[in-house]
């Protein structure tokens, strides 16, 4: 939007190569050890299609009678605009270390991260009486946090060289704040909304009915019908 074209997104990082210190220089087991930490912010409008700063009108099929009964051409808004829309802002903190052992043959990396996205851009939910296409809104705040680990092995001693690695990660995703009046609907099939943006839940989680399973045979269906008075 025209009112929020520019923003500032700073970042900072620091690292310490520990194996270069005097107390580790003579430790042959450790080839490399680095402790690191970083914090940064960035902006995004990737969820936003073009021309969202423009209000669109349509003339097609818009007619109304005047006082004499003569029909005149008219116009109506076909897409609303949200001039207060702001950048998505993501702040991420990361703490980790890189370790290599036995002449760089064995490597291990570990990270903890906490990523917080504010003013997440999503299509707004408004009363049907509003009319026209719904504008995008800053829908809320999403938090992602977890751990990442990678263990690797590299053999460079022979003509035949090879390497292998194993990684593992965890992720907790949650909508921590909802800035609109109701949950925001996402993808839909045949008119039914399948995914939702709702406070206290993972972002765009699937929402539907729980089932007790399926009938494996006619006897199970007959038993259910007898118990609940249905006609499956």
Language model region names:
Residues 222-232:
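Short, intrinsically disordered, charge-balanced linker/junction segments flanking boundaries
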Residues 1-206:
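Extracellular/periplasmic, surface-exposed regions of secreted and cell-surface proteins
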Residues 167, 205-217, 221:
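Exposed, low-structure sequence patches enriched in small/polar residues
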Residues 156-161, 214-216, 232:
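Generic structural signal for short, solvent-exposed loop/turn connectors between secondary structure elements
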């Amino acid at each position: 939007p025209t009112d929020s074209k520019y923003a500032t997104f700073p970042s900072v990082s620091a690292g310490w190569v520990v194996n270069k210190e005097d107390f580790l220089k003579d430790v042959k087991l450790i080839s490399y050890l680095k402790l690191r930490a970083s914090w940064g912010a960035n902006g995004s409008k990737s969820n936003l299609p073009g021309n969202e700063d423009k209000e669109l009108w349509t003339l097609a099929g818009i007619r109304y009678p005047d006082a004499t009964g003569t029909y005149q051409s008219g116009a109506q808004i076909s897409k609303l605009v949200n001039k207060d829309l702001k950048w998505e802002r993501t702040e991420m903190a990361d703490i980790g270390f890189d370790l290599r052992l036995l002449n760089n043959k064995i490597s291990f990396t570990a990270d903890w991260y906490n990523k917080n996205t504010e003013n997440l851009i999503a299509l707004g939910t408004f009363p049907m009486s509003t009319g026209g296409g719904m504008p995008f809104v800053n829908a809320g705040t999403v938090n992602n946090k977890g751990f990442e680990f990678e263990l690797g092995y590299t053999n460079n001693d022979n003509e035949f060289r090879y390497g292998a690695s194993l990684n593992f990660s965890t992720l907790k995703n949650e909508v921590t704040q909802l800035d609109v009046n109701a949950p925001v609907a996402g993808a839909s099939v045949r008119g039914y909304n399948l995914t939702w943006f709702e406070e206290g839940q993972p972002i765009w989680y699937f929402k539907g009915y729980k089932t007790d399973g399926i009938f494996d045979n006619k006897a199970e269906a007959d038993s259910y019908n007898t118990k609940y008075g249905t006609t499956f």
